[in-house]
């Protein structure tokens, strides 16, 4: 698979990346499913490995995907290839008891750093290649707090 420069970062990523939301397995909040379905861990491992062997080196996950389980599964499946892959993870939304959609936004500096720390632990790595805000700020004030 062809690789392309990711802007001016020096990172070369595959033309196709793998989104990992559904690969964390089933999770729900207040009975509301937070995933596409119940992808079993062995199936997720096969998908991760097949993607890697097919030339995909960009994997997009998030702290909120299956309540962090997507990050754990990605780490477990590809730990021996960490230097060959690029991990993109996101922060800024988290589970809550809100209705009808049980997610809240927190783009504060403190929350972003603490979320990154938790992601690094779940991913069993010292770094992520790209760290993203899961959604844009709702206001100028929210942007200033980042």
Show which residues each predicted segment covers.
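Glycine/Thr-rich phosphate-binding loops of Rossmann-like dinucleotide-binding domains
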Residues: 26, 69, 97, 138-141
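Generic enzyme active-site microenvironment
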Residues: 58-61, 88, 127, 132
């Amino acid at each position: 698979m062809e690789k392309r420069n990711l802007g001016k970062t020096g990172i070369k990523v595959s033309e196709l990346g793998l989104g990992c939301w559904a690969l964390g397995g089933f999770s729900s909040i207040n009975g509301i499913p937070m995933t596409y379905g119940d992808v079993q861990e062995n199936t997720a491992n096969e998908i991760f490995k097949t993607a890697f062997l097919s030339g995909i080196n960009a994997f997009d996950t998030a702290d909120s995907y299956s309540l962090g389980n997507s990050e754990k599964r990605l780490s477990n499946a590809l730990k021996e290839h960490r230097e060959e892959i690029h991990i993109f993870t996101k922060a800024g939304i988290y589970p809550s008891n809100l209705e009808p959609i049980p997610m809240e936004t927190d783009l504060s500096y403190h929350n972003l750093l603490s979320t990154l720390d938790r992601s690094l632990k779940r991913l069993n790595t010292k770094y992520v290649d790209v760290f993203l805000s899961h959604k844009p700020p709702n206001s100028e004030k929210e942007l200033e707090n980042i």
